[in-house]
């Protein structure tokens, strides 16, 4: 099996002025494509090693599967949870659960923004299937700090390639801009999926 890069669910300039066409083009076509290529290359190495019975390079390939596979999956989520029609707050069951698990939307958002400021990769809202609750997590790179058994609901990429061209070192401005394009329909669907699977 090989993995492919899906097109963005909107035009490259659709999120302007919050995220520029140039950043989306670089981010999707170069960075995200690189994770897809890296995942495919690592899988090829593993398949060749299994066939040959030689496993000297398998440990490195396994790490590359984790890093690049997680990068591909998280980027897919990132693109899907934004749209030019975004910018509202969540509604319905997800909004109620955020209020239940965090106290309020404002408390969740403040904690999520803190995660985004600290992360060396991603801030994620996840459904923790062990505790049956929503949590914010700080993920470095694509795979360090993830919580086992968690189901991602909302993903924010805070690698520098996501914002530096548009915002320079002002990551907080980029995080604020992200909330102007968040489309809660996809996270709400992912939350409903998690509840069906785990509750």
Curated annotation (Swiss-Prot):
It is an enzyme of class 1 (oxidoreductase). It holds the Pfam family Sod_Fe_N. Its cofactor is Mn(2+). It catalyses: 2 superoxide + 2 H(+) = H2O2 + O2. PANTHER family: SUPEROXIDE DISMUTASE 2, SUPEROXIDE DISMUTASE [MN], MITOCHONDRIAL. Its EC number is 1.15.1.1. GO terms for molecular function: metal ion binding; superoxide dismutase activity. It comes from the Archaea. PROSITE patterns: SOD_MN (PS00088). Belongs to the iron/manganese superoxide dismutase family. Gene3D superfamilies: Fe,Mn superoxide dismutase (SOD) domain, Iron/manganese superoxide dismutase, C-terminal domain. The keyword Disulfide bond does not apply. Destroys superoxide anion radicals which are normally produced within the cells and which are toxic to biological systems. Keywords: Manganese, Metal-binding, Oxidoreductase. Mn(2+) binds at residues 28, 75, 157, 161. It comes from Haloferax volcanii (strain ATCC 29605 / DSM 3757 / JCM 8879 / NBRC 14742 / NCIMB 2012 / VKM B-1768 / DS2) (Halobacterium volcanii). InterPro entries: Fe/Mn_Superoxide_Dismutase, Mn/Fe_SOD, Mn/Fe_SOD_BS, Mn/Fe_SOD_C, Mn/Fe_SOD_N, Mn/Fe_SOD_N_sf, SOD_C_sf, Superox_dis_Halo. SUPFAM superfamilies: Fe,Mn superoxide dismutase (SOD), C-terminal domain, Fe,Mn superoxide dismutase (SOD), N-terminal domain. Binds 1 Mn(2+) ion per subunit. This is Superoxide dismutase [Mn] 2.
């Amino acid at each position: 099996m090989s993995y492919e890069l899906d097109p963005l669910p909107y035009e490259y300039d659709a999120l302007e002025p919050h995220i520029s066409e140039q950043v989306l083009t670089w981010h999707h076509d170069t960075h995200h494509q690189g994770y897809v290529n890296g995942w495919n290359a690592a899988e090829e190495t593993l398949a060749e090693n299994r066939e040959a019975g030689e496993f000297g390079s398998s440990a490195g390939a396994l790490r590359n599967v984790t890093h690049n596979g997680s990068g591909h999956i998280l980027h897919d989520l990132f693109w899907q949870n934004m749209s030019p029609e975004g910018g509202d707050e969540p509604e319905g069951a997800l909004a109620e659960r955020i209020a239940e698990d965090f106290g309020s939307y404002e408390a969740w958002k403040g904690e999520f923004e803190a995660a985004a400021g600290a992360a060396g990769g991603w801030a994620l809202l996840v459904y923790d299937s062990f505790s049956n609750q929503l949590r914010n997590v700080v993920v470095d790179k694509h795979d360090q700090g993830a919580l086992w058994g968690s189901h991602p609901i909302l993903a924010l990429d805070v690698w520098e390639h996501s914002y530096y061209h548009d915002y320079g070192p002002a990551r907080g401005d980029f995080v604020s801009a992200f909330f102007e394009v968040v489309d809660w329909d996809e996270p709400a669907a992912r939350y409903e999926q998690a509840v069906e699977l785990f509750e």
